């Protein structure tokens, strides 16, 4: 008798352009497990610095490895010309994350091409990109919006990180490094929150089919991550996850919700029930709620709640906090976080972009894809 095979979901994270490649480097540095990393760029020199196992320099003929010159059309053509190579690299993936910095050349133009290929191959495709600061100029902003719109059409779910929100986070005494580090954690934990659900066994398992059921063709989505320690930790973490500390956005009206509670082996049934009930109350009454736990003793006393809410009406996620949350009052703390920490992806109007978080892409003055590189990813 042939023994049963153990099939694991194949998850690939693709960084394209300066910002995307640096995002991938950061995830590798932080030890994100259970995924395959790919780095794609028109800048051959920058690509040499990548820690990804798979590297692909695109546009060799058109850019001679010197970058896209902040021209999305050059980035798009470079990716199109390498379509066969990209398809071969993505083949076999069950889920593909595409990350980039919007507004420049390679990431803006190439990300939709990669997402289209991944989706055509049947992979659940999630985009994670940054929107530039307003002070980076109207041209860059317009290019970013066009790139986001194109990527939205190519992805199942799109997460957009609005850099302007960094200017509104916390008091003016918060250091630049702490602000960027906080945004960095949102990006990393967002991807990790999804992948851990699939790759890490829990007492209540969420498998890839559950994740796909919520995120496939989701369009507008809201992703929240909250963590807390001490008394009422699970409830606090859940409240943070479903209320944006920065934007007072809520998941009210979501038709599909994916929820994960991660904690040590002392995670109690009562506190799990409290957290799950809060999320259930915040969603649409008829929402499809998929719930799972991850036991991770390295968290110690900390409980981490990840919520992905999707299937909103045309007007997008609501902005009313749940249970009188002090949403807008939370400030960015130093990286040496205290007992309570929080991060959340921000929703926007459906007309502009589907799903949002707090993130960054600074550096002005360069004329190439380096402008795509989020400052918190720079070393």
Curated annotation (Swiss-Prot):
Domain of life where this protein originates: Bacteria
Q: Which Pfam families match?
A: FtsZ_C, Tubulin
Keyword GTP-binding listed: yes
The terms describing its cellular component in GO are: cell division site; cytoplasm
Cell compartments where the protein resides: Cytoplasm
Q: Which residues bind GTP?
A: 18-22, 105-107, 136, 140, 184
Principal subcellular localization: cytoplasm
Q: Which GO terms describe its molecular function?
A: GTP binding; GTPase activity
Its GO biological process terms?
division septum assembly; FtsZ-dependent cytokinesis; protein polymerization
Q: Which CDD domains match?
A: FtsZ_type1
What InterPro entries does the annotation carry? Cell_div_FtsZ (IPR000158), Cell_div_FtsZ_CS (IPR020805), FtsZ/CetZ (IPR045061), FtsZ_C (IPR024757), Tub_FtsZ_C (IPR008280), Tubulin/FtsZ-like_C (IPR037103), Tubulin/FtsZ_2-layer-sand-dom (IPR018316), Tubulin/FtsZ_GTPase_sf (IPR036525)
Keyword annotations: Cell cycle, Cell division, Cytoplasm, GTP-binding, Nucleotide-binding, Septation
Q: What interactions and quaternary structure are annotated?
A: Homodimer. Polymerizes to form a dynamic ring structure in a strictly GTP-dependent manner. Interacts directly with several other division proteins.
Instruction: Give the protein's biological function.
Output: Essential cell division protein that forms a contractile ring structure (Z ring) at the future cell division site. The regulation of the ring assembly controls the timing and the location of cell division. One of the functions of the FtsZ ring is to recruit other cell division proteins to the septum to produce a new cell wall between the dividing cells. Binds GTP and shows GTPase activity.
* Protein family per UniProt: Belongs to the FtsZ family.
Q: What is this protein called?
A: Cell division protein FtsZ
Q: Which gene encodes it?
A: ftsZ
């Amino acid at each position: 008798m042939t023994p049963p095979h153990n099939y694991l979901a194949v998850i690939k994270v693709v960084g394209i352009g300066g910002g995307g490649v640096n995002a991938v480097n950061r995830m590798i540095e932080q030890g994100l497990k259970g995924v395959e990393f790919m780095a794609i760029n028109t800048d051959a020199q920058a690509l040499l610095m990548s820690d990804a196992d798979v590297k692909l320099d695109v546009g060799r003929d058109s850019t001679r490895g010197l970058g896209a010159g902040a021209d999305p059309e050059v980035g798009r053509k470079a990716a199109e010309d390498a379509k066969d190579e990209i398809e071969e690299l993505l083949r076999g993936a069950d889920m593909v994350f595409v990350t980039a910095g919007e507004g420049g050349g390679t990431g803006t133009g190439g990300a939709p091409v990669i997402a289209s290929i991944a989706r055509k191959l049947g992979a659940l495709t999630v985009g994670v990109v940054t929107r530039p600061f307003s002070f980076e100029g109207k041209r860059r902003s317009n290019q970013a919006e066009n790139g986001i719109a194109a990527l939205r059409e190519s992805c199942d779910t799109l997460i957009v990180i609005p850099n302007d929100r960094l200017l509104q986070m916390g008091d003016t005494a918060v250091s630049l490094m702490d602000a960027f580090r906080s945004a960095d954690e949102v990006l990393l934990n967002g991807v990790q929150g999804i992948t851990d659900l699939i790759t890490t066994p829990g007492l209540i398992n969420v498998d890839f089919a559950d994740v796909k059921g919520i995120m496939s063709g989701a369009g507008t989505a809201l992703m929240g991550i909250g963590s807390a320690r001490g008394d009422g930790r699970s409830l606090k973490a859940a409240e943070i996850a479903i209320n944006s500390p920065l934007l007072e956005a809520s998941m009210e009206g979501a038709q599909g919700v994916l929820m994960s509670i991660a904690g040590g082996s002392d995670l109690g049934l009562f506190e799990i029930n409290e957290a799950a009930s809060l999320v259930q109350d915040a969603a649409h009454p008829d929402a499809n709620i998929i719930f799972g736990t991850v036991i991770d003793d390295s968290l110690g006393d900390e409980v981490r709640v990840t919520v992905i809410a999707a299937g909103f009406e045309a007007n997008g996620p609501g902005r009313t906090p749940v249970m009188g949350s002090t949403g807008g009052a939370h400030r960015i703390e130093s990286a040496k976080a205290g007992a309570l920490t929080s991060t959340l992806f921000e929703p926007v109007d459906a007309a502009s972009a589907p799903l949002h978080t707090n993130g960054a892409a600074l550096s002005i003055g360069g004329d190439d894809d380096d402008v795509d590189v989020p400052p918190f990813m720079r070393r």
